[in-house]
């Protein structure tokens, strides 16, 4: 109703706020099959609503999920050491996989810092690049064509030949910054400036890099440089901290539980990920914003 009444209000640094008209629908059946369906939901919300998206997805529809963490399809494509691994933490009953044919999916990642202070209001703080690519990797006309369409529409988008790597690169930031901000309720600059939490951040980052490489990814990352880049972003309030403060369910499963599923299958020891997941999970559960469970061992 908010979108129908007032459209989408958008504000960005050094730009006047503007309102974008939106054709909003409460029922997907009223829209019919689309050329492109962009799924920008939090990962934990998708299983409950994915069946309702069926009217949007025709035989030629391209589905572009752009959530944080590891998506359900991440290990379903050939050519990786964990081929066929189904992430129960992300798609617990296989509902997403059944509803969205893998052949119609493009992988996607949004490199931006934004917030939604009120319904129908988006504040864009930094970044803004979108990366899309074939789940199995490699170049494709489909990815290139949609990157051009999105860019022409005002959303700078690049076609990637290794979207799984791009998603893991973003995971490096999410898995370190988000849970630490949830636990400490601090912005990223304070986390990196504090010697104790900086050490935890560094150990998490190092462990996530090693896990990604064990999973077959080529990750050329300098840990100290990545930490410095995080600090240069300034006082970022992560999405997980925003959700905690707003009383919204937090996105721990795709960001921490899914990598831990990967680690378990590879028999890769991940003590920092396990510890931070346990602490962040309990912190969120205490606030009523996450299931009261964790990873044992």
Please describe what each predicted stretch is:
Residues 7-12, 208:
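Short polybasic amphipathic segments
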Residues 177-181:
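C-terminal or late-domain output modules
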């Amino acid at each position: 109703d908010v979108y129908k009444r007032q459209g989408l209000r958008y504000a960005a640094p050094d730009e006047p706020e503007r309102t974008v008209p939106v054709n909003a629908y409460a029922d997907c059946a009223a829209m019919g099959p689309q050329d492109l369906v962009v799924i920008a939901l939090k990962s934990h919300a998708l299983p409950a609503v994915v069946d309702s998206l069926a009217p949007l997805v025709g035989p030629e529809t391209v589905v572009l999920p752009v959530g944080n963490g590891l998506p359900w399809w991440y290990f379903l494509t050939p050519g990786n050491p964990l081929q066929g691994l189904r992430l129960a933490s992300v798609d617990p009953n296989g509902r997403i996989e059944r509803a969205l044919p893998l052949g119609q999916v493009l992988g996607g990642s949004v490199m931006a810092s934004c917030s939604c202070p009120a319904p129908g209001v988006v504040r864009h703080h930094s970044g803004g690049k979108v990366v899309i690519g074939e789940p199995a990797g490699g170049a494709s006309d489909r990815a290139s064509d949609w990157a051009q369409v999105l860019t022409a529409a005002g959303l700078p988008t690049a076609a990637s030949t290794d979207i799984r790597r791009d998603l893991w690169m973003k995971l490096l930031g999410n898995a370190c910054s988000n849970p630490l901000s949830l636990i400490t309720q601090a912005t990223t600059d304070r986390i990196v400036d504090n010697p104790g939490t900086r050490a935890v951040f560094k150990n998490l980052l190092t462990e996530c890099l090693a896990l990604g490489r064990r999973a077959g990814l080529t990750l050329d990352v300098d840990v100290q440089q990545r930490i410095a880049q995080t600090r240069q972003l300034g006082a970022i309030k992560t999405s997980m901290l925003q959700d905690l403060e707003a009383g919204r369910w937090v996105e721990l499963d795709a960001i921490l539980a899914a990598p831990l599923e990967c680690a378990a299958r590879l028999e890769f020891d991940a003590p920092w990920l396990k510890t931070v997941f346990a602490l962040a999970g309990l912190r969120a559960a205490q606030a009523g914003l996450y299931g009261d469970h964790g990873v044992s061992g």
